Amino acid sequence: MSTADRLFPKSPTVNSPHGVRSRQHMICDERVVAAVPARGGSTTVPRKNVRTLGGKPLVVWPIDVAHDSSHIDRTIVTTDDEEIASTAEQNGAEVVERPPELATDDALVIDALRHLTETLRADGETATYLVMLEPTCPFRTVDDVNACLDLLTDDDRTHDSVATFTEAELSPHRYWDIDDGVPSPYHEDADPWLPRQQQPTGYELTGAVYAFEIDALPDEGTSLLFDDPGAVLMPRERAVDIDTELDFRFAELLLEEGIYERKNDFDTGSTASRD
């Protein structure tokens, strides 16, 4: 498949499982593109991005959320895989072919986003903001996406990038280092024996939502949080990140037990920033 074949012309409407809906909703008159990175070569969970979770392929979860957000104008899957591309198209997303060198186990997602934004700019796309939604974090909600975009575009702040975080299960002061079989606290001044309530709280970066100004994306580097980053907090129930078979089974359990549905009505967590 070629980039020309996969990058569809821009149009005011898109057919999706949610019906035909306008793509003219904007934030402060600025266009927003949702990017879903989904390569075909997962090794820990083979064919992970097209594996069914809760009745639909994993890659469709972020597509549906993007379609439900009134802030997002285009939803584009970047992939090297024909089956993923076909699944994305059938569910109302556009597709851009990812070069093989950007789809290896060692490839960085930021490089795939650089390729995508360069392709979009060459195609005449003038969007100001990009939101990345990884399929491996399926339980994000529209509120999570909109909270990141609202923080990114808040006139009272100057963030160039925003991402979702969740409270870590383990305090950073309870991490250990083991050198030649000898354990020691990972942080020199930490006391891992103190009760949990007396330990500092740490936060984990999730794969649920990243949002940034397209023109602020650095030409080099590995981080998707740059310049003055902001954070949106989300509950752990929505922050499930599927990297292993055990993670997938856990996500299935949340659905089977109805835990995800019950938690899905929670308000998006508070926002935080570096300043």
Where are these regions (language model features)?
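Conserved core of the sugar-phosphate nucleotidyltransferase
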Residues: 111, 138-228
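Conserved alpha/beta core of the MobA/IspD/sugar-nucleotide pyrophosphorylase nucleotidyltransferase superfamily
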Residues: 27, 111, 202-275
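N-terminal nucleotide-binding beta1-loop-alpha1 segment
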Residues: 20-46
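Low-acidity, Ser/Thr- and Arg-rich intrinsically disordered low-complexity segments
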Residues: 2-6, 11, 16
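Conserved SAM-binding loop
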Residues: 51-52, 77, 132, 240
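Short phosphate-binding loop-to-helix
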Residues: 82-131, 139-150
